[in-house]
Amino acid sequence: MLMSKLADVFKNHKVFIPFIVADDPDFETTVKNVVALAKGGADIVELGIPFSDPVADGPVIQAADLRAFAANVRTKTVFDIVEAARKETAVPIVFLTYLNIVFKYGYDAFLKRCADLNVAGLVIPDLPYESRDEIVPIAEKYGIDIIPLITPTSGHRIEKIAKSASGFIYVVSSMGITGERDEFFAGLKALVAEIKQYTNVPTAIGFGIHTPEQAQTMAGIADGVIIGSAIVDLVAKEKQQAPAAIEKFTKQIRVAVDAKKQISVK
């Protein structure tokens, strides 16, 4: 397998990964939002491909998907957004997508297009571990990481998921769907410690984080922090003025995350 571009991002510092939905509220604003996140200090940008049945997502992200559908989003639109953003930023990008989107486009064609645009990885919430072999070999051919999710209920599956991981591991902070919350799984630190027994692949915690204080706490537990709903909510409120607002928010999170001791991922 090719060396992971994403794992390299985690070397020597804590990583911040903001999430936005592609084509929300429109094409041009999404391109500007990606650039704004990079300017604000994002290490990796997670770009959601809208889907009609997003089982992992809460109401904020579901509403963003609906706004994107109203803007007539297609999978090609998402690739075109990345192509336009690439004229202004080289920030690593990962897609959050559901398996049917990739399947309908064609695994090889989808992953080749990702490689052409320097999309470094895919997060696929509805990809069962047992089915990963239908896509991972093709992803490896193009040097793209299929980023696994580990949840508080992964249990005995943690070892095999961790040992087969590449890029980074998306650690789900609590059960349920995405969305802002004030309480997280009490065993999160122990969960990350267990993952670390099996792999040197970095971990990033997501689901529910929405304040600099929470981000700082999570950066003390894992190698990176993922924030989605709080940023998507800003996009909903600010619409075409969102780039300035999310750049400001990203800078605040960057400061909070950087306050944690720098680490070196082996």
UniProtKB/Swiss-Prot annotation:
Intrachain S-S bonds: none
Active site: 46, 57
InterPro entries xref list: Aldolase_TIM, RibuloseP-bd_barrel, Trp_synthase_alpha_AS, Trp_synthase_suA
Keyword Amino-acid biosynthesis: yes
Gene Ontology MF terms in the entry: tryptophan synthase activity
Reaction(s) the record says it catalyses: (1S,2R)-1-C-(indol-3-yl)glycerol 3-phosphate + L-serine = D-glyceraldehyde 3-phosphate + L-tryptophan + H2O
Superkingdom of this protein's organism: Bacteria
GO cellular component: cytosol
Keywords: Amino-acid biosynthesis, Aromatic amino acid biosynthesis, Lyase, Tryptophan biosynthesis
EC numbers: 4.2.1.20
Pathway stated in the Swiss-Prot or TrEMBL entry: Amino-acid biosynthesis; L-tryptophan biosynthesis; L-tryptophan from chorismate: step 5/5
SUPFAM superfamilies: Ribulose-phoshate binding barrel
Function: The alpha subunit is responsible for the aldol cleavage of indoleglycerol phosphate to indole and glyceraldehyde 3-phosphate.
Family of this protein: Belongs to the TrpA family.
PANTHER family: TRYPTOPHAN SYNTHASE ALPHA CHAIN, CHLOROPLASTIC, TRYPTOPHAN SYNTHASE, ALPHA CHAIN
Assembly behavior: Tetramer of two alpha and two beta chains.
Protein name stated in the entry: Tryptophan synthase alpha chain
Organism name: Lacticaseibacillus casei (Lactobacillus casei)
Organism classification: Bacteria, Bacillati, Bacillota, Bacilli, Lactobacillales
